[in-house]
From Swiss-Prot:
Its EC number is 3.6.1.-. Residues 9-24, 618-631 have a biased composition (Basic residues). One of its GO terms (biological process) is ribosomal subunit export from nucleus. The modification Phosphoserine is found at S103. Its main location: cytoplasm. Keywords: Cytoplasm, GTP-binding, Hydrolase, Nucleotide-binding, Phosphoprotein, Protein transport, Transport. The keyword tRNA-binding does not apply. It comes from Saccharomyces cerevisiae (strain ATCC 204508 / S288c). This is Large subunit GTPase 1. The gene is LSG1. The keyword Repeat does not apply. Transmembrane segments: none annotated.
Length: 640
């Protein structure tokens, strides 16, 4: 009997059914964005019960401590409004436009070109009259009963008032150039903490221009916070100065009753490395032997002129600080004398701390502003060092190029390089630049539009770039921006050395250009050259029969590196590198020479093209009525 239903067709099994599990990853992109918005836009209730809502981004602490020294007009307006807690509403039909108002500064002065002695004297007199208005922001008085919001609001109001005072100073004196200064309140808060905590505030300045890096109002602020606190001016990089220059600066500081000392963090760190290498054979007097010179001066001045060693600097700190710490110690901790180190970026605060501690405790960089936050380092059982981030204090300068040459503004972010390079060419003698780099700078006379013996910025940069082979795309174009970065970094690092003299002791007037040249003439001698360059110049001098080398007199005759010497009738020249791109030549003549070089002939057109008569030029398409006697183009082939 047949089955009631037909058997089902066999099918392959599909396998087990998938089990859907819930995703364990709760932090998806959507949820992450949602949580971030909730955290940023959180509602805060003030102590009086008022609701406070903000849309400010929640940023990390290191982002808030970024240094801000320059702002555009719009950024400055918005930051000032944010400090004042101003509200904004959008006005779609507003016709207000934002324009940039040029300051009244002379373009030559602001960009960094040379100034006459009379112009410099007039500006300096006005700067000294307004120096009392160059203030640093004070932290307002506070107590433990204040809430976080009240303290923050009070600090912002005081900081905003300080910004307004400096803005009024700049607007009312348009002929003065105010240096870029720190505009981030979070960075100034680090200074406030250092001043409150420290018993001795050490202001570190660059020995090449101490008055630019010194803030007089900071010393007043330290005394205002507590009269028992002490100030000390640490003149770092003193090894770059000759003893004659240190004597001049010591006399000036003593006449102004400024507590100061000379120090060299670089030399101290080098001696630490030498001490590790020599071990027990190391002699302490090695530090002093390099500094012994014969000078007759007052005993008090000579004692101050000496560059201190590490141990002597530690003893000086302890002698200048109060005998007992001003702040009470924390429970269970011994009392510590706190020594705060403050100053501009790139003056050597971190290097000074590393030399004192004897090991690399703080990161060091050639870029200004490496230290980002307030740090404490224990020097001994009774001394604590406080390292403050680099702060650019408000001050007066003659031009923007001076700020770049002093290392205040970073060179890698520089756009206008002509002004700073012009200052270097003006301050460093031409023969010494040629000896340092082994090049020859070709200058134009004043009749030809040049500066005579003083090269212009373009002449210096072109000579350096062509000697090094720094060229832009194309033929015969020197890469001047790249050359300027190398030269300016050598100037900031002290390879090209220039020291600003102190003002006159009688009336505080600045030195003239001729007096500055006399003050620095001992820096541009043969013995100051690097060892490798000194050996090259000495060998070249021996080949010419010169025993005692005078760079100003003999350099034009010597041949070394890329500098090819001349004689009394022939000027020296510089060897260029980089092939065709590093040589000046006419591209058209070079093309003709290469083309006709095959048959050793030149091709010249006897008649210009526009004078060749073509009778068929008026006929359309040149198809009919062709003249049988049409003149042909005649080329004359002449032997070379």
């Amino acid at each position: 009997m047949p089955p009631k239903e037909a058997p089902k067709k066999w099918k392959a099994p599909k396998g087990p059914k998938p089990t859907h599990r819930k995703n364990k990853n709760k932090l998806e992109l959507g949820r992450a964005i949602k949580y971030a918005r909730q955290k940023e836009n959180a509602i805060e209730y003030l102590p009086d019960g008022e609701m406070r809502f903000t849309t400010d981004k929640h940023e990390a602490n290191w982002v808030k401590l970024r240094s801000v020294t320059q702002e555009s007009a719009l950024d400055e307006f918005l930051s000032t409004a944010a400090l004042a807690d101003k509200d904004f509403t959008a006005d779609r039909h507003s016709n207000v436009k934002i324009i940039r108002m040029d300051s009244g500064n002379d373009s030559a002065t602001s960009q960094g070109f040379s100034m006459t002695n009379e112009q410099r004297g007039n500006l300096n007199a006005k700067q000294r009259a307004l120096a009392k208005d160059l203030i640093v922001p004070r932290r307002p008085e506070w107590n433990e009963g204040m809430s976080k919001f009240q303290l923050d609001r009070q600090e912002k109001e005081a900081f905003l008032e300080w910004r307004r005072k400096l803005a009024h100073l700049q607007e009312s004196n348009e002929d003065l150039l105010l240096t870029p200064f720190e505009r981030n309140i979070e960075v100034w808060k680090q200074l406030w903490r250092v001043v409150e905590r420290s018993d001795l505030v050490v202001q570190i300045v660059d020995a090449r221009n101490p008055l630019l890096f010194r803030s007089v109002d900071l010393e007043r602020y330290v005394k205002e916070s507590d009269d028992r606190k002490a100030n000390l001016l640490l003149v770092n990089k003193a090894d770059l100065l000759t003893k004659k220059q240190r004597i001049a600066w010591a006399k000036y500081f003593i006449s102004k009753n400024i507590s100061f000392t000379f120090y060299s963090a670089l030399r101290a760190n080098q001696l630490l490395e030498k001490q590790k290498e020599m071990g027990e054979d190391y002699r302490e007097q090695d530090f002093e032997e390099a500094d012994k010179e014969g000078f007759d001066a007052d005993e008090k001045v000579m004692e101050k002129v000496k560059i201190l060693s590490i141990d002597q600097l530690e003893e000086l700190f302890l002698s200048k600080a109060p005998n007992e710490p001003l702040l009470p110690p924390l429970p269970g901790q011994p009392p510590l004398i706190n020594i705060g180190l403050v100053g501009y970026p790139n003056v050597g605060k971190s290097s000074t701390i590393n030399s004192l501690v004897g090991a690399k405790k703080v990161s060091v960089s050639s870029t200004p502003g490496k230290t980002k936050h307030f740090q404490t380092i224990k020097l001994s059982d009774s001394v604590m060092l406080c390292d403050c981030p680099g702060l650019v204090f408000p001050n007066f300068a003659y031009n923007k190029g001076e700020l770049v040459c002093n290392g205040v503004l970073p060179i890698d972010q520089l756009r206008d390089y002509i002004g700073p390079a012009g200052l270097v060419a003006e301050r460093i003698p031409k023969y010494y630049i040629e000896a340092i780099y082994g090049i020859h700078i070709q200058t134009k006379s004043r009749d030809e539009g040049g500066n005579g013996d003083i090269p212009t910025a373009q002449e210096l940069l072109v000579a350096y770039a062509r000697a090094r082979g720094y060229m832009t795309q194309g033929y015969g174009s020197a890469d001047e921006p790249r050359a300027s970065r190398y030269i300016l970094k050598d100037y900031v690092n002290g390879k090209l050395l220039y020291v600003n003299p102190p003002p006159h002791l009688e009336d505080d007037t600045p030195y003239t250009r001729e007096e500055c040249e006399e003050f620095n003439k001992d820096l541009y001698v043969f013995d100051r050259l690097p060892d490798t360059r000194k050996e090259q110049v000495q060998n070249a001098a021996k080949a010419k029969g010169i025993d005692i080398v005078d760079l100003a007199r003999d350099l034009n005759q010597l041949t070394f590196s890329a500098h090819t010497g001349g004689d009394t009738q022939k000027e020296a020249k510089s060897v260029t590198h980089g092939g065709k791109q590093a040589a000046l030549y006419n591209a058209a003549e070079d093309l003709d020479r290469d083309f006709f070089k095959m048959n050793n002939v030149e091709g010249r057109l006897s008649t210009p093209f526009h004078k060749v008569q073509n009778s068929s030029a008026g006929k359309r398409h040149n198809k009919k009525n062709k003249s049988k006697n049409a003149k042909s183009k005649v080329f004359s082939i002449e032997n070379n």
